[in-house]
Amino acid sequence: MTRVRFAPSPTGILHVGGVRTALFNYFLAKSTGGQFILRIEDTDQARLVPGAVDSIKESLQWLGVSWDEFVIQSERLETYKKISDELIAKGHAKSEDGAVRFITPTTGKTSWTDAVGDKEISFENKDIEDFIILKKDGYPTYHLANVVDDHFMQITHVIRGEDWIPSCPKHILLYKALSWEPPIFAHVPNVLGTDGKKLSKRRGAKAVLEYKSEGILSIACFTSPTTGI
């Protein structure tokens, strides 16, 4: 069964770029009789915005997007700690000043065939620095939480923006270290603003709910050239 997830961070508004990613995942799930999971990635506690989770839910509901499962990462800290301990025990990670750092191989390559364009993407392992997977505060970084949750939630396809391509080899290395099978990766082009740069919450992208308050029909988000859907 196809299982996909939309995994926003509650650090601000949901904009058209995020909606596009959600819709790609949602349409794949519905067209294949699969399941769509809404996963809130709230491990960056310093940047959480009050009310953001409810806003994300309301935005998706306005678009007619429903989810089969709802998960909040901050409720799964014991799982991340257990996996980080396992990586240390296997020699793939080390404790460092209260945090845990993954030890990247210094030889070989990490490659995958991306579902967008069916192209092989490859990185030299020597160019990938060791990276933090568990922070001093006990919260996982995006890299560890992403891989652990995708594995245990049996995610079959990871559809996300192409700006995540540089992170993908780190995720694949984690899968290999844990002897887990990675999902199919599909990195889609990002939605750009009029300045030619990626839309982002930090750069003032318009909230989806603003369109709702302006009386714009939700179907416009499915047919707009902005979303490319």
In which residue ranges do the predicted regions lie?
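N-terminal Rossmann-like or analogous alpha/beta NTP/dinucleotide-binding catalytic cores
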Residues: 1-99, 126, 166-178
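Non-catalytic terminal extensions that flank enzyme cores
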Residues: 1-13, 34, 186, 197-199, ...
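Short, histidine-centered active-site or binding-site loop motifs used for metal coordination
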Residues: 6-10, 40-42, 148, 152, ...
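Glycine-centered secondary-structure boundary/capping sites
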Residues: 62-64, 154, 179, 215, ...
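Short acidic (Asp/Glu) and glycine-rich catalytic loops that position anionic groups and cofactors
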Residues: 63-64, 151-154, 199-204, 220-226
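Active-site cores that bind ATP or allylic diphosphates and position pyrophosphate for catalysis
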Residues: 72-73, 86-201, 207-211
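Short, surface-exposed, charged/polar-biased interaction segments
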Residues: 77, 81, 192-195, 217-220
